[in-house]
């Protein structure tokens, strides 16, 4: 949001079987000439455990303003051990209005993230996150061949979360 505040929210439902669905929305602003004003994501997946390892597989669809013409979807797989988790997302499909010579297809971008989360004795959850987004589709969206890195610290209690987050994206393009 160009160093401005964002209002975000989401709703999730998880069944005892491990299947889940959810939605998330935020205002967005990517700078001068930006046609985006909001992002609305929907996702569905299946979470399960094998021994001490937790798994998560699913699909995530990113929906932007109709003027933006940059909607896309990803498939993902995540694995957790103890307080740590790692997730890999891969571009599955796009409805992006591609420029001349661009043809984004399956696997044209990826997102790799590492997370750590722990609950303190007072019931407050603390989370640390770092992720990296790269690939041809990411380059077109961010304007930089080296992709971008995002990171955050979060605090949660009783269903509410406060998060401080940032990226290495400066001035409309990721710094190398």
Locations of regions flagged by a protein language model:
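Outer-membrane beta-barrel proteins
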Residues: 1-176
């Amino acid at each position: 949001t160009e160093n401005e505040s964002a209002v975000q929210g989401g709703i999730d439902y998880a069944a005892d079987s491990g299947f889940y669905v959810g939605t998330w929305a935020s205002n967005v602003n990517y700078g001068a000439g930006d046609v985006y004003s909001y992002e609305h994501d929907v996702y569905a997946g299946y979470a399960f455990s094998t021994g001490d390892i937790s798994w998560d597989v699913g699909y995530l669809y990113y929906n932007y303003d109709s003027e933006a013409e940059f909607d896309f979807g990803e498939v993902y797989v995540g694995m957790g051990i103890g307080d740590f988790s790692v997730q890999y997302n891969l571009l599955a499909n796009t409805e992006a209005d591609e420029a001349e010579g661009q043809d984004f297809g399956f696997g044209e971008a990826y997102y790799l993230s590492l997370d750590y989360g722990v609950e303190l004795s007072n019931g407050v959850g603390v989370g640390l996150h770092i992720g990296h987004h790269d690939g041809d589709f990411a380059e077109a969206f961010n304007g930089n061949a080296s992709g971008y890195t995002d990171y955050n610290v979060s605090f949660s209690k009783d269903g509410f979360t406060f998060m401080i987050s940032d990226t290495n994206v400066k001035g409309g393009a990721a710094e190398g």
